[in-house]
Amino acid sequence: MYRTYKKFKKPGILLREKYSLVGVSRREGSGYSRLSADFELSKRWQTQNGLIIRGTGNVLTAAYLENNSTTRGYLLKVYPLGALELKYPLFRGKNERSEVLMPIAQIVYSTDTSSTTNPIDEDSSTTEFDSTTLFKLRKIPGIDRQEKGLRLNAGLQYFYEHKNNYKYT
């Protein structure tokens, strides 16, 4: 797997790239090879009153070559995704401590542009959903299946820090 992160000269713009090559073979049945690429471009703004806005565009692609003893097949999957995230940090500091309460709202839309409804399904297709994945754009860890449609994620983050390096999140 190969990953890169690139910040542009304009502040707040970030490009992320990730590539991987996977090959699966079996004694019985068919095997396949997969080449995938994941591109993400995001831009962050902050308004004068402290509202943090982040827009994100992402395209995940996967090209499959099925290696069967009798046939050979090709499949291309493309998963475009767009997201808008709003955060509004509320800060309170007093003497030796500081607290931040941050409401977060995220709206995400994704779709599957491939023509087939029977993808090769070798990766985990179970959605990982807990407090650490709530604001992840893709909650299914594998590439074979992705969430589709419009969804809204909302929550709160709380940070507490004491002068003596005591932190609570």
Functional labels for PLM-detected ranges:
Residues 1-169:
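Outer-membrane beta-barrel translocator/pore domains, especially the C-terminal barrels
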